[in-house]
């Protein structure tokens, strides 16, 4: 969805016109560059215009073939630099993370007493998703609800037919996206 470029003085995010407004709240520390053409082309034009001599890339964020192509094109592997930069959060980022977690937590508190024997996994998943959206979430990136034997499947898709039985284990793994920051909660 985006190409990021970090210089010694500023961070830039090159993204498509339709994505740029959505990224702005989550990227207050960088300049969003709205590109109508290709994101890579926009970043390359910027690099040439600013006469930037060395460009690094995050090898963990690209596949092997693309990494080889970037290296052959003269880019340098930046190792874990991007990950190190993202480890430290600004106050506004921390606030967004907390809000994302609060939305998910509040949704669980509302849904937990509603879970009853005979409900399907899908019905419970829909309840938790609707509560997160009602609570202010921008999107639901994942929402796993499983009962009984299905709790052993880490990537289970909630079933429309599997119903909760009496005294059966319930596992929920869910989270929401809020202004570019995701929460991730597991409850059983």
Name the predicted role of every residue range.
Residues 6-7, 58, 146, 173:
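Short beta-strand segments
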Residues 38-138:
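Flexible, acidic/His-enriched mid-domain "rim/lid" segments that flank
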Residues 28, 69-72, 159-160, 186:
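Short, glycine/charged-enriched secondary-structure capping and boundary segments
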Residues 23, 66-68, 181-182:
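Short glycine-/acidic-enriched loop or helix-start segments at secondary-structure transitions
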Residues 8-10, 52-54, 167:
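A general structural motif
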Residues 82, 119-188:
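Short catalytic-site patches enriched in acidic/histidine residues
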Residues 20-21, 63, 151, 178:
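Glycine-rich nucleotide phosphate-binding loop and flanking beta-alpha elements
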Residues 1-49, 102, 160-162:
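N-terminal accessory/capping or targeting/presequence segment of soluble
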